Amino acid sequence: MPLLWKRGFLLVICWIIVRSSPTPGSEGHSSVADCPSCALTTLSKDVPSSQPEMVEAVKKHILNMLHLRDRPNITQPVPKAALLNATKKLHVGKVGDDGYVEIEDDVGRRAEMNEVVEQTSEIITFAESGTPKKTLHFEISKEGSELSVVEHAEVWLFLKVSKANRSRTKVTIRLFQQQRQPKGNSEAAEDMEDMGLKGERSETLISEKAVDARKSTWHIFPISSSVQRLLDQGQSSLDVRIACDLCQETGASLVLLGKKKKKEDDGEGKEKDGGELTGEEEKEQSHRPFLMMLARHSEDRQHRRRERGLECDGKVNICCKKQFFVSFKDIGWSDWIIAPTGYHANYCEEECPSHIAGTSGSSLSFHSTVINHYRMRGHSPFANLKSCCVPTKLRPMSMLYYDDGQNIIKKDIQNMIVEECGCS
């Protein structure tokens, strides 16, 4: 029923546009006035500023799909060592030979196989120091709190073992979630005072694991149910106390926070960076604790098999797909978008002589964004035009980026890249 409604709505819109378009006998009528996709070609030739306008439309479209008003302001990015280590260890991406992060685009491959793809976000939140000592603070991104189901959530901790340690002794690492202490519970308040929390917070064991203390390595602690409860309560701050009773005896220690880069005085009373990190400091930064969360909400999608559309190669004058790539580095966005390196903002152009065939309203998302952007700018090629050559197949796009809170987010965005074009 929703699909039929969308088709009906599209036909009504097309009918209104056709009724408002100039008649075939109108003076100055041309093939350009028959279809906005034809006007795209004309615009690129007649309007010198068309490419900058297209780029601006693409930027607005990406921000809209990521539910952002403006691009995040990155003042203190996560150290590259920590970023590369986190993405290397998780399935959100891999590090290429050149040191850049490449997204593992599983969602795109699934879309090619016509599988139902659910909108998901994979979020990496690096720990901040908490109170009291040995407490980690995670500020979960708003992106994660808006999604309904936590597929899994894990805290990653690095256990560093002294080279002199030859013991086979295992140590038990425990994670306690700290929460505000309810009023009126005097007995619990006394217990908190014994733990040095002054009765302000209670804590609950949320994960524990016995690990081998013979080698330095990462350890994963699942806390999915705890994060789900936290989000269900409308909260986004997670405080976790880390306990390891036998670590000191076995010569092992948990890297709870990477060492910060030292500051130096520049002689004028201002601080400046104190040079490059040492090898040990670089290693500490790469072992910074983090929380990895995969969250989702289902979105019904229906797929239909279609014949592959035409590519615009300069030799065809019927409805086809025009390739248009926007490099994030060229537009100054590479500081907050980790991967991919750019966006294939393909669109549809050329003439469409065939009759109207209904398509899903969601399929028009990007095409309509570009057309409306030009129409609002008052470019004459788009005045009183009827839509005809439109996307008939789109695929998702995976993005890895920083939000304003310096969290790393991997988001699979539906209907982002035009794959095929056809006549509506």
Swiss-Prot record:
Keywords: Disulfide bond, Glycoprotein, Growth factor, Hormone, Secreted, Signal. Ciliary ganglion neurons. Levels are higher in the choroid than the iris. Residues 21-308 form a propeptide. Inhibins and activins inhibit and activate, respectively, the secretion of follitropin by the pituitary gland. Inhibins/activins are involved in regulating a number of diverse functions such as hypothalamic and pituitary hormone secretion, gonadal hormone secretion, germ cell development and maturation, erythroid differentiation, insulin secretion, nerve cell survival, embryonic axial development or bone growth, depending on their subunit composition. Inhibins appear to oppose the functions of activins. It comes from Gallus gallus. Disulfide bonds join C312-C320, C319-C389, C348-C421, C352-C423. Residues 178-200, 260-288 are annotated as: Disordered. Coiled coil: none annotated. Residues 263-275 have a biased composition (Basic and acidic residues). It holds the Pfam family TGF_beta. It is found in: Secreted. One of its GO terms (biological process) is negative regulation of G1/S transition of mitotic cell cycle. One of its GO terms (molecular function) is cytokine activity. Residues 1-20 form the signal peptide. This is Inhibin beta A chain.
